[in-house]
Amino acid sequence: GMTMAISKAKEEGCEAVICASTGNTSASAAAYARRGGMRAFVLIPDGYVAQGKLAQALVYGAEVLAIKGNFDKALDIVKELSEDHPVTLVNSVNPYRLQGQKTAAFEIIEFLEDAPDYLCIPMGNAGNISAYWMGFKEYYNAKKIKKLPKMMGFQASGSAPLVFNKTIENPNTIATAIRIGNPVNKSKAINAKNESNGNFYDVTDNEIIEAYKILGKEEGIFCEPASAASIAGLLKTKENIPNNSKIVCVLTGNGLKDPDCAIKNNDASFKNNLEPNIETITKAMGF
């Protein structure tokens, strides 16, 4: 999605891009803007962006502006700035973003050789669920698949405007990537849910962390907390899904983007300050 938005901005002669971000968008915008020789301005909620994501934006040379407010306030600001100044907005309100992101649905279809029965996906600004549905519909209308998936969107309980059908003024969740109270793509997401006979559900932070741990311990997959919302949601709603259904859960971010969460939320054994000798290490290993 971002490579499409940046490429079109470059094509149109843009010299700078801007976005509001909970972390992932800023990292992506900064990377592609740098590759395209453009400046990248990113507005983030001060103190509410995972360090791994902030590090990416900084390394790519983004001009980071941390505000006293949440993502939704940052988005309001960048939307207004992009209307009055020579910067291109690359949040998912930019239609080119969704045109790029929809190709993820193409990849799923090509891998499975059909659409899944269910697609489970985290929702923050709701660009992904909107774009995936766009992609599935395009393949269906082109008669490349025989069915469409039910779109299942999951939000953190403390940040679930689509689930509760209201703006959340002060969203809060451990899953920082989806800590958004007023998603810009809400109408598109609701349309995806309704057209597909899907549903939206909320999952608690505890449910997210439990799924996060399961992915690491049982599947060897290290994702960021927001990604685990799709697994948490599936586990929470599995009784409503028929046996033998083909289900795809989308994981939207690598765990290294939020290392603090990993350090604080794991069941691993970590013994430190050990003496450097065979006897101590053998004992620590339980032999």
Regions found by a protein language model. Give the residues of each.
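A glycine-rich, Thr/Ser-enriched phosphate-binding loop motif common to dinucleotide/cofactor-binding enzymes
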Residues: 1-4, 91-105, 224-228
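Active-site nucleophile and cofactor-binding loops and adjacent substrate-binding regions
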Residues: 17-26, 93-97, 121-126, 204, ...
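Active-site-proximal loop->helix
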Residues: 18, 26-69, 73-80, 163-168, ...
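Catalytic phosphate/nucleotide-handling subdomain of diverse soluble enzymes
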Residues: 35, 231-287
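Active-site/ligand-binding loops adjacent to catalytic centers
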Residues: 69-86, 138-223, 264-287
